[in-house]
Amino acid sequence: MAARRRRVNRVATISVHTSPLDQPGTGDAGGMNVYIVEVARRLADLGIEVEIFTRRTARDLPPAVELHPGVLVRHVTAGPYEELDRADLPGQLCSFLSGVLRTEAMYEPGRYDVIHSHYWLSGQVGWLAKERWGVPLVHTMHTMAKVKNLRLAEGDKPEPAIRVLGEEQVVDVADRLVANTVTEARELIELYHAPPERVTVVNPGVNLNIFRPAPKAAARRRLGLPADARVLLFVGRIQPLKAPDVMLRAAAIMIAERPELRSRLIVACVGGPSGNGLARPSLLADLAAELGIADVVRLEPPAPQPELADWYRAADLTVVPSHNESFGLVALESQACGTPVAAASVGGLRTAVRHGVSGVLVDGHDPRQWAASLAELLDDPDRLAALSAGAVRHAARFGWSATAARLAEVYTEALERVHRTVPVGANS
């Protein structure tokens, strides 16, 4: 008779530097926030409770907030509430860990079956909590310093040595490493020497209930966009890594080559400054003025998901020119709404976008090459329509429920591995 599999009842999810309650597209909030929220909700629907530990960023935040039945967000005091740069967070990890351990100590031993940490800072906390509680650590990198440093944008700062070391330590101690794509798995193995047997690929997903096709004309009316405009859309945090400047420069070239485009082209950017982009919050506005296209550029603040879905539907193309992406949720959201994507052929975007079927992948970051690719697509409505249909089919393969179900399997496998290797009484 086969042994009964151990059940995972509750997961401690650690997200030190960004709260799942924050609006994606501003500050440090981005795709990782979406990932944590969507996965937590669906794990809870599977009967696995999730408690998310994140740093308190305002004095008036309650100790805990129920995000969804079975999902609790716990605010941990560690350092000043506001104006703490991410570069200063390593100095607050001991305080954060202390808060996590104090929370666990309020309950009977064994409250958490698994720890899932997100980003290297959280991995450091997860490492020590794993040692204290005797439970497995599952870690998702989301981005990796060595990869980012290999593909730096012009003017961007390299990731510091402390992060590289911290990531190497987390890779060494994690029981399972979750990679978003096969590409990321290969980078973990080749750059960080992760044992292949501890690396599992689990694709992120998209909320197919929110991001779904709907009439373009109605979306444009709601957003105040002309019905006959040609709309290029960028969604994301405004920082060198995301390369929104490439889209603006490409648009300027398109207008210079075809002046009649100026009266119809709209270049929309939805998002706020983040990371190294905070040094110049007016970067895109200044660049648009410098390029002489301020009249066609529309800068919008980060939008909640229902409004964001309208932006995708209203666009002819979503442009994702990032220097690197571990996956690229923006690309997937756009495709789920039926809008093809022109994306840089880097990292996880090669998985998120199916070249020639749901969009196109562009090599390099030369604005002239991007201008040619964008113009070619805008000039071919039949091809755009075919890519739109392909985008919906492609995105339908990436529901969050499938992501959560696979993660639940990873948690169970990690739990069974720990119980096979830890001697009886070792944690008593």
Swiss-Prot record:
SUPFAM superfamilies in UniProt: UDP-Glycosyltransferase/glycogen phosphorylase
Residue positions binding UDP-N-acetyl-alpha-D-glucosamine: Q23, P24, G31, R237, K242, E325, E333
Binding positions (1D-myo-inositol 3-phosphate): H17, D28, A29, G30, G31, M32, N33, R86, Y119, T143, R163
Source organism superkingdom: Bacteria
InterPro entries in alphabetical order: Glyco_trans_1, Glyco_trans_4-like_N, Mycothiol_biosynthesis_MshA
BP GO terms, sorted: mycothiol biosynthetic process
Reported function: Catalyzes the transfer of a N-acetyl-glucosamine moiety to 1D-myo-inositol 3-phosphate to produce 1D-myo-inositol 2-acetamido-2-deoxy-glucopyranoside 3-phosphate in the mycothiol biosynthesis pathway.
UniProt protein name: D-inositol 3-phosphate glycosyltransferase
Organism field: Thermobispora bispora (strain ATCC 19993 / DSM 43833 / CBS 139.67 / JCM 10125 / KCTC 9307 / NBRC 14880 / R51)
